[in-house]
Swiss-Prot record:
Induction text: Up-regulated by biotic and abiotic stresses and senescence. Down-regulated by cytokinin and nematodes or Agrobacterium infection.
GO cellular component: endosome; Golgi apparatus; Golgi membrane; trans-Golgi network
UniProt superkingdom: Eukaryota
Bilayer disposition of the protein: Single-pass type II membrane protein
Location(s), subcellular: Golgi apparatus membrane
Lumenal-facing ranges: 31-500
General function of this protein: Involved in pectin biosynthesis. Catalyzes the transfer of xylose from UDP-xylose onto oligogalacturonides and endogenous acceptors.
Sequence intervals crossing the membrane: 10-30
Consequence of gene loss (knockout): Decreased cell wall xylose.
GO molecular function, one term: UDP-xylosyltransferase activity
Enzyme superclass (EC): transferase
Principal subcellular localisation of the protein: Golgi
Gene that specifies this protein: XGD1
The name this protein goes by in its record: Xylogalacturonan beta-1,3-xylosyltransferase
Length: 500
């Protein structure tokens, strides 16, 4: 039965009144919504990626906000037009009008928060290290001429200890990869590889990265010495000395890791390195110079006339490692018992030694030069009795003599051309060694006799101080030769900026 007319009117009025109240409430809610409250603000830790899509058109607009950006404004503010583009559509003109006057519904936006990339973190970390080193360099807290900038070096080493991570590629099989000689004059190659590649109480390095994305640099564990031994020998013809097989092996390895991982292509090899003391090691890049243009070679044979690049490559010391030992004997003899002015004993390898022998072989009691020691004369003990130890280049510029002299407390006399000395980024070689060009070999005695006693005693003291940087420890210790090699790599990485 139909309701009375008066009752229907009352219901209509009540319904109209309710609708009016609802509209007023909605209007108040929209008008009181804060206009400037940040939507998200993770400026210190994250980059923000926001995707807004139309439910009908399925269009997507991505906007990234880097950590230096201001706080994000509400998505519906008109002043965000240039930053965030929102797409929506409807078949109703009323809906179009409503969309122009209110924020998009929460269901129309997708918010994705992503952490900064691994490279961003690494570059940020390196920037902090650079700032700390620069600050330390300006304070000059250290007083010493052993280093070019003592404060900068010590701060840099501290930053390296706290931050530096190295990833060793796992690709490749022994004996050509992940293994190297640990004795004799090429031994530093295998010792370094063992430190960075092998797990164990004596080899687990603090610098090894747990994951490649956390690494600052990447070590290619390629043994030139093992390639020569297993791939080349025996060499029975002149053609057997061709470097083609060596080139093919290293280039194929780089192709594998560059295809499998993003890191080589990201830096064009600028944060990748190898270490070798073999005479052929400098030649690894000659097969494809463009590919290895930025690649870091850690070389004993650091000859600038044969392609060594001091601003890219790293000069490492050649250390003779007797079997079962980590270096020559220590001979800290007092200057008072050093009666020999200068000493050298060794084979006539290379042109420089031929010139040395021509002028000094067994010709002087103060400058004692031998190709073979006389009976009853001990090599190590004679170094310990000498003030200066002659270190002429042999077939190559590098020689174990420099390190042997330092171990013996004997001031090194470096006779070479085009030799980029180890760790010369930080060490002031002039403070603890004498450098004589090949053209002045005949003047050796005059030059050394002109060194005053005061200067000699200072140099002797610094030889004892610098020795710690040429000592091989397993596991490695701060400031030893292993850490100095890594520090040279660390400096190259500090000079490289990626992703900027």
């Amino acid at each position: 039965m139909a309701a009375p007319r008066s009752r229907r009117c009352s219901l209509s009025l009540l319904t109209l009144f309710s609708i009016t109240l609802i509209l007023i409430s909605v209007s108040l809610f929209v008008s009181t919504k804060p206009a400037n409250k940040p939507f998200l603000d993770y400026r210190n830790q994250f980059s923000i990626s926001i995707s807004i899509s139309s439910p009908l058109e399925q269009n997507t607009t991505n906007t990234s906000f880097v950590s230096a950006s201001p706080p994000l404004s509400p998505l519906g503010q008109s002043n965000t037009t240039n930053t965030i583009l929102a797409s929506s559509s409807s078949s109703s003109s009323f809906s179009d009008h409503q969309n122009q006057n209110k924020s998009p519904s929460p269901t129309s936006k997708k918010i994705v928060i992503r952490k900064r990339s691994g490279l961003d973190k690494i570059e940020s970390d390196l920037a902090k290290a650079r700032a700390a080193i620069k600050k330390a360099a300006s304070t000059q807290n250290y007083v010493s001429s052993l280093y070019k900038n003592p404060a900068a070096f010590h701060q840099s080493h501290t930053e390296m200890m706290n931050r530096f991570k190295v990833w060793t590629y796992t690709e490749g099989e022994v004996p050509l990869f992940h293994d190297g000689p640990v004795n004799d004059i090429y031994g530093i190659e295998g010792q370094f590889m063992d430190e960075m590649c092998v797990d164990g109480p004596k080899s687990r390095s603090r610098f090894r990265a747990d994951r490649p994305e956390n690494a600052h640099v990447f070590f290619i564990p390629f043994s030139v010495a093992k390639v020569i031994h297993f791939v080349y020998k025996p060499i029975t013809s002149v053609e057997g000395f061709s470097r083609a097989r060596l080139h093919r092996l290293i280039e194929d390895y780089v192709d594998v890791v560059a295809t499998k991982h993003p890191y080589w292509n990201r830096s064009q090899g600028g944060d990748h390195f190898m270490v070798s003391c073999h005479d052929w090691a400098p030649d690894v890049i000659d097969g494809n110079p463009k590919l290895f243009e930025k690649f870091i070679r850690g070389l004993c044979n650091a000859n600038t006339s044969e392609g060594f690049r001091p601003n890219v490559d790293v000069s490492i010391p050649e250390i003779y490692l007797p079997k079962g030992k980590l270096g020559p004997s220590f001979l800290g003899k007092s200057p008072r018992v050093r009666s020999i002015l200068a000493f050298f004993a060794g084979r006539s390898h290379g042109e420089i030694r031929k010139i040395l022998f021509q002028h000094w072989k067994e010709m002087d009691n103060e400058v004692q030069v031998y190709d073979r020691l006389p009976p009853g004369k001990d090599y190590t003990k004679t170094m310990g009795m000498s003030k200066f130890c002659l270190c002429p280049s042999g077939w190559e510029v590098a020689s174990p003599r420099e390190v042997e002299a330092i171990y013996a407390g004997c001031v090194p006399v470096i006779i070479s051309d085009n030799y980029s000395l180890p760790f010369s980024d930080v060490l002031n070689w002039d403070s603890f060694s004498i450098q004589i060009p090949v053209s002045r070999i005949k003047e050796i005695k005059t030059i050394l006799q002109s060194v005053s006693l005061v200067r000699y005693l200072k140099m002797y003291k610094r030889v004892l101080e610098v020795k710690q940087h040429f000592v091989l420890n397993r596991p490695a210790k701060p400031y030893d030769v292993m850490h100095m090699m890594l520090h040279s790599i660390w400096l190259r990485r500090l000079n490289l900026r990626l992703g900027t």
